[in-house]
Amino acid sequence: MAEYDADVPAGIVMTSMEAIVGWLRKTSFWPLTMGLACCAIEMISYGGPRADAARWGHEVFRASPRQADLMIVSGRVSQKMAPVVRQLYDQMPEPKWVISMGACASSGGIFNNYAVVQGCDHIVPVDVYLPGCPPSPDMLIDAVFKIREQIQHWPLMGHMSEVEAAKEKKALDAKTTLEQKGLMR
């Protein structure tokens, strides 16, 4: 339970600015329209009336990376598309988050060849991995709620750039999905 200060009048709520901004950000962020394969169909149905993304404040998918703060990489990423994905990520304003949607985006899926990137974590830092082929809109809703939890506790101003740089370095230095194959044997 919260402690109440006797000096504060009734009806006054005391909180931090980071808590307010975190709450506002998590209830209104803008996903980037970026469908690369069949997972994009499930991502599109996430915005439809059955899943109803508008309940959580993400009713509009943005076509411009400069207006988006959530990238959903849905589907396989070819070697030719990889620089475009990175360029779109770099054009997004800070803070920004990434969901890797589906088996192809997370690990290359069934396409284990030279033409497909074996996981978009080789290109951009990923915050949430969403398994499945293709994952359902309900699974995407769960991933969005995990992102919302991260957004709620994101630092405000000050050391935000250092936190973002550390997050990207940690993600890009981590063991890739290609190196992790065979760990379940």
Swiss-Prot record:
Family per similarity comment: Belongs to the complex I 20 kDa subunit family.
The name under which this protein is listed is NADH-quinone oxidoreductase subunit B
The EC designation for this entry is 7.1.1.-
Any one GO molecular-function label of the UniProt entry: NADH:ubiquinone reductase (non-electrogenic) activity
- What membrane topology does the annotation report for this chain? Peripheral membrane protein
The gene designation is nuoB
Annotated positions binding [4Fe-4S] cluster: C38, C39, C104, C133
Q: Tell me which cofactor or cofactors this protein depends on.
A: [4Fe-4S] cluster
